[in-house]
Curated annotation (Swiss-Prot):
It comes from Saccharomyces cerevisiae (strain ATCC 204508 / S288c). Present with 1360 molecules/cell in log phase SD medium. Keywords: Cytoplasm, Phosphoprotein, Repeat. Residues 660-692, 714-761 are annotated as: Disordered. This is Cytoplasmic export protein 1. The gene is CEX1. Associates with the nuclear pore complex (NPC). Interacts with GSP1, LOS1, MSN5, NUP116 and TEF2. GO terms for molecular function: tRNA binding. Component of the nuclear tRNA export machinery that my collect tRNA from the nuclear tRNA export receptors of the aminoacylation-dependent export and may deliver aminoacylated tRNAs to the translation machinery pathway at the nuclear pore complex.
Length: 761
């Protein structure tokens, strides 16, 4: 319904409530709407009158009586608007019509229905000096606390000075408008008879208590007053045995009690709840959520204040009530999880409870935590609950550690990336080596459950899972090993084929040799599943390399590979031809001038060959030709031609700069001057050879087929081998190039690409 046109007709009027468009219920006189007060967002109910000349007196009487009657049990009136005939409103607390459609569910708890009847009797008791006249099924409402309240004061009149004729006339008019039958015209009995009919509507004859039947029949006939009817019911066994009636009276007065009195009331609630939880099921909507739970939360906060700090509190000054904290918290958690309703401040209560050191409190929170995730935001869980929650994994009590472990999956979706992939995994690494078998088993199960949300960066997830499952497969107990195989089975889609081939199969393989036949059987099945995944991937591989040799697709008989003697001879001959060809191409050429005699060649080779080696390679001490000739008497002839060698390029070695280790002499040192010897040594050719400086010989490894060039030629030269050379065609410069430095031999790289597990624990 559009109320804007109505309010615009009122000059300078601002309606202080927001009203919904659709009515929740409607009678012949009223339309009932849910609304909200603009000032503080308080939920309200707005009754809009359907004013007409026929019912105007009835509506105005209802508005007037709503202003002056402030009686418990009537709808609490906040404000009325009756200045305009088109906009007559009665604003009350938030109420809903009695759920007659759900009466069957409410009737399952007879204590709850009896409690509602007692609430109506209490309201009518306050109205003993008034005639209500409208008591019926349509006049019963339920407020936000689940209490039964009455609305509809169209016929309400004071008994003092009331004219029976005038009341009967108004009553007939009212029941004609609503289309119902007038129970009685007598103002003294109309409410009694209306109450009797209402009780019979609430309780079927088969459900009516035996000690109530007579009294209900009497009041239905108007034979007794409401006050007498109430007194008779209070004396029945049904009334006295109803625990909710007495508890409700105490609960209504809780706001005026001191902390000790509140604790007594809640202790009675504890006894009732622990004796029979069914008493608190199927109560009137709102009774548990908005009445019992908020009061329990308030008393728990007082007890928590005493438990957290030693500061004096009103409770603490009188007696120690900390032992009541656990049962009260258990009742609150159980009630909220059943009704799935959470009062204001419930989140703070839960977060503060996690800070308590009491193991029983923490255990309760862990049990109910999966059901409490709804009202808690992700930030509250990650910042206020998780730091205290995770400490349970290091608790000395195994039961608490296990329960904490089981609760992890319900909060992982609310954790930050750092908490999930760093902190949590570190704690799980510790529980995997716990002394308790169940904890070790559950650790693997939890890792399997949260594996899908672990970080996949840098192969982190694959390494973590492989490490965890490998460790559990080595567990001395069978249960953790089976849990590891279960985790591998659930995680098969998380591994790519390369990871399976390189890591996962090696993880499963030890299970094939397990002592337990169950483990061996499951490991075999799992191994085949992973192998099947590899085979499927292998079938999808397409060979598109056009440059591949045809031999790649042929089978090779390695048993007879290279054993054919004829083929081996052909191959050896080919290798020898290649070797000689390389020598021919890389050997230096020498020229012999015609004016050099053969004697001079002998003298040049045998007399001064060693002495003419330069120190360019850093190992041979150089001497001048002139000083060397002083101790030699070469035989020369005019016909001996002089040989000229081809210049040789010497490659610089990596260790040429290491000149201070005593192995290499400086060129400027005194050792460069050859010493004179009185007794020259004789060569094998009977020629005198002057003693040379210290000779250093280097060897360099080369492959047999490597091309030999002058720069990299490697030979081994000694004095005796030099004196035995008889070939006259080899130039002296080639002797100089034959002495090279010794090459380094590369060792095996011990730090190969070993596939290490990235534990990240």
């Amino acid at each position: 319904m559009n109320f804007s046109s109505i309010f615009k007709s009122i000059s300078n009027f601002q309606f202080p409530y927001t009203i919904e468009e659709t009515a929740i219920t409607e009678t012949a006189l009223w339309q009932c709407f849910d609304g909200t007060r603009k000032a503080d967002s308080l939920p309200v109910t707005v009754f809009k009158a359907k004013r007409s000349p026929e019912n105007e007196s009835l509506i105005l009487n209802a508005v007037h009586k709503s202003k002056i009657l402030k009686i418990p049990g009537l709808c609490t009136v906040l404000e009325t608007f009756d200045s305009d005939p088109q906009s007559t409103f009665i604003v009350t607390e938030r109420v809903v019509p009695f759920p007659w459609d759900n009466l069957g569910s409410l009737s399952q708890n007879k204590f709850g229905v009896e409690l509602g009847i007692s609430q109506l009797l209490a309201t009518l008791g306050f109205l003993k000096n008034f005639v209500l006249g409208t008591l019926s099924k349509d006049s019963v409402f339920i407020n936000i606390k689940g209490e039964w309240v009455l609305f509809g004061l169209e016929l309400c009149s004071s008994k003092e000075g009331l004219s029976a004729f005038e009341f009967a006339s108004r009553a007939r008019s009212y029941y004609n408008i609503i289309g119902s039958q007038l129970p009685c015209e007598d103002p003294n009995t109309i409410d009694s008879m209306g109450l009797g009919l209402l009780i019979k509507s609430l309780m079927a004859p088969s459900c009516l208590p035996k000690d109530w039947i007579v009294n209900v029949n009497m009041i239905s006939d108007g034979k007794i007053t409401i006050e007498n009817f109430r007194k008779r019911l209070e004396n029945t066994e049904t009334w006295r045995s109803n625990p909710l009636i007495n508890f409700y009276q105490e609960l209504r007065e809780l706001h005026i009690k001191d902390p000790q009195g509140k604790l007594v009331v809640m202790s009675n609630l504890e006894n009732l709840y622990l004796e029979s939880r069914e008493i608190f099921r199927n109560l009137t909507p709102g009774m548990i959520e908005n009445f019992i739970i908020p009061e329990l939360c308030e008393i728990i906060k007082l007890l928590m204040t005493q438990s957290i700090s030693s500061a004096a509190s009103p409770i603490g000054m009188n007696f120690n009530a900390s032992h009541k904290l656990v049962p009260f918290l258990a009742i609150v958690l159980d009630l909220t999880s059943e009704t799935n309703t959470f009062p204001v401040g419930f989140n703070d209560l839960i977060t503060q409870s996690f800070k308590l050191p009491d193991r029983q409190v923490r255990f309760l929170l862990l049990i109910y935590l999966p059901k409490l995730i709804g009202p808690l935001s992700k930030s509250e869980i990650s910042s206020r609950i998780y730091p205290h929650f995770i400490q349970g994994l290091t608790d000395s009590d195994a039961t608490l550690r296990l329960q904490t472990l089981k609760t992890i999956p319900c909060i992982v979706s609310c954790l930050t990336e750092r908490q999930l992939n760093n902190e949590l995994l570190r704690f799980l690494a510790k529980t995997q080596v716990d002394s308790d078998v169940e904890i070790r088993t559950w650790t693997v199960i939890i890792i399997s459950k949260i594996s899908t949300i672990l970080s996949t960066s840098v192969g982190n997830r694959s390494n973590i899972l492989a490490t965890a499952f490998t460790k559990s497969l080595k567990d001395p107990q069978v249960k953790p090993r089976l849990a590891a195989l279960y985790g591998l089975e659930k995680s098969i889609e998380l591994f790519d084929v390369n990871t399976i081939a390189n890591k996962i199969l090696t993880v499963i393989a030890p299970g094939l040799l397990d002592k337990s036949p169950i483990v061996r059987g499951r490991a075999k099945i799992l191994f085949e599943e992973y192998l099947e995944k590899l085979e499927k991937e292998a079938q999808l591989i397409q060979t598109n390399d056009s440059t591949a040799d045809s031999e790649d697709v042929k089978d090779i008989d390695f048993e007879n590979y290279g054993c054919d003697e004829e083929d081996m001879n052909k191959e050896d001959n080919l290798l020898a031809a290649q070797f000689l060809n390389n020598l021919r191409l890389n050997s230096p050429s020498a020229t012999t001038p015609s004016n050099i005699t053969e004697s001079e060649i002998d003298s040049a080779q045998d007399g001064s060959g060693w002495d003419d080696l330069s120190d360019t390679d850093g190992f041979i001490t150089n001497g001048t030709t002139e000083s060397f000739d002083e101790t030699t008497n070469p035989v020369t002839t005019a016909s001996t031609p002089k040989l000229f060698g081809k210049p040789i390029k010497i490659n610089k070695s990596w260790n040429d700069e290491l000149n201070d280790d005593g192995w290499i002499q400086d060129e400027s040192g005194p050792s460069k001057v050859p010493q004179k010897h009185t007794r020259p040594q004789n060569s094998t050719l009977a020629k005198s050879i002057a003693p040379s400086s210290r000779l250093s010989i280097k060897k360099k490894k080369t492959t047999i087929l490597a091309p030999r060039n002058i720069a990299s030629n490697s030979t081994v030269t000694t004095k005796s081998s030099l004196s035995n050379k008889t070939a006259r065609s080899k130039p002296i410069s080639s002797i100089r190039g034959s002495v090279t430095k010794k090459g380094n031999v590369d060792g095996w790289d011990d730090d190969g690409d070993s596939d290490s597990w990235d534990t990240n624990w």
